[in-house]
């Protein structure tokens, strides 16, 4: 058990010999426990150097070693769900040194990524995709007769999503040759029932039991009543000591629960399941943060950590600035005090969306639906139908998963639902899988929807209240990180729908339209260029009246932290075209490509959305007028 994150690189003589799983498979089984300890210690050290997710990874060290030891990777396909648990996998697959730059600019991704390594069989970041992807690989192997094996590793939280059960149902129906491993690190499905459960897990996974069962089916195939009696006896015995009957009903052979930190048990069980025909389901119990005492005691707090600084010198001013999620957390509590019809709904984002205080103060009005974004939106729609005022707190990247429900269940019926959309824009080290850079595009095309983008924390609070009081669906998209340091009104005041504000009036004939966070960087450019700056506030409805007063402008510039295609800039151009106004325009935003992980500041500079980049782009455009 480690009590501290090592700041000096540990000695790892066994791990140093592993540059690929082929090297691992040359080890004797007796060496694996020592390798596991070295792997866990190196992972602690490396994440301490860079920051990143490590709680889930610490919990699957033994499982990762067992899988790469027994399967012929990369020929056999191992698919990790979400990817938070894949750090040990990266270390064992030739990226040990690269882990020291994980999530850094030009470093490796924090998630499995197909173009990074042949061992990363499926790119992930969002949850609950592993079973469906592994099933697809299993069926491809069947059709192409490659003999490849497919394994999906999924956490108990991700198992709550409907997509997981859709894939399980299909896999059972087509009798796919695949193994699904449930990494249960919260014991949210069921606790193992002591020694009896462990004993039967070993028996059910054994080839002897499998042969007896198949032989019995053949012998009694002509005696339906006897076969049915045997099946029921097996079900009743499993049901006494096993939580897995649900998976059996879906067509899987369920094994477990077993101790995910018992290497001998893992090796024996997985080896027995590896060559079985048909869908297999292995339930392993692990400890999130295993081997690191603080993480075992606080698995949520240690889900991810920041870089360990040897001599930390915090920026005092920056630390005092509220994060946008904190602005939301304060507003939703204040609004709930004033209106007992307000409820908060979130798909497993209680901490990230800052709903901890709300859940404590208003437990009967707080609904965490787990990783079920589609259900979260339709649940809100149902509540709104009968007089409740739901606030859906959700990350921009995850709202994409509920787009049909957003249109069909909420907007089409013009229901009073407020979407508090966090992590809008670029999200730094989490990279393209978590970037919220499409919401302005996919929201503004939906009828009845009001779409707002705050430039600072006070605007964010006002927009949340505006959206809450609006009769119909409304969305406020706000970024990750801290605000601008402006004073925040304590009252629950609102804004006029579709009305911008002028932050600066210039004389150069340049009009800059800022949407959301980039507005303050645009202000710096506006001061240099003597440009007029509009904080547009509303992407939909756009402030037509104000924009049309600038029909004689030399250049209209739009700035947004969203995809340029179909975004806020497109809304401005559409307005100008509809009114036969021929003014040169410049749309600054995110190009038609995925932006790789880096610090947020580096990403803004890369795409030209920092103050200097905005100014240079405008100056370049002026040279072509």
From Swiss-Prot:
GO terms for molecular function: 1-deoxy-D-xylulose-5-phosphate synthase activity; magnesium ion binding; thiamine pyrophosphate binding. Keywords: Isoprene biosynthesis, Magnesium, Metal-binding, Thiamine biosynthesis, Thiamine pyrophosphate, Transferase. Pathway: Metabolic intermediate biosynthesis; 1-deoxy-D-xylulose 5-phosphate biosynthesis; 1-deoxy-D-xylulose 5-phosphate from D-glyceraldehyde 3-phosphate and pyruvate: step 1/1. SMART domains: Transket_pyr. Its EC number is 2.2.1.7. Mg(2+) binds at residues 156, 185. It comes from the Bacteria. Its cofactor is Mg(2+); thiamine diphosphate. Gene3D superfamilies: 3.40.50.920, 3.40.50.970. Belongs to the transketolase family. DXPS subfamily. Catalyzes the acyloin condensation reaction between C atoms 2 and 3 of pyruvate and glyceraldehyde 3-phosphate to yield 1-deoxy-D-xylulose-5-phosphate (DXP). This is 1-deoxy-D-xylulose-5-phosphate synthase. It comes from Marinomonas sp. (strain MWYL1).
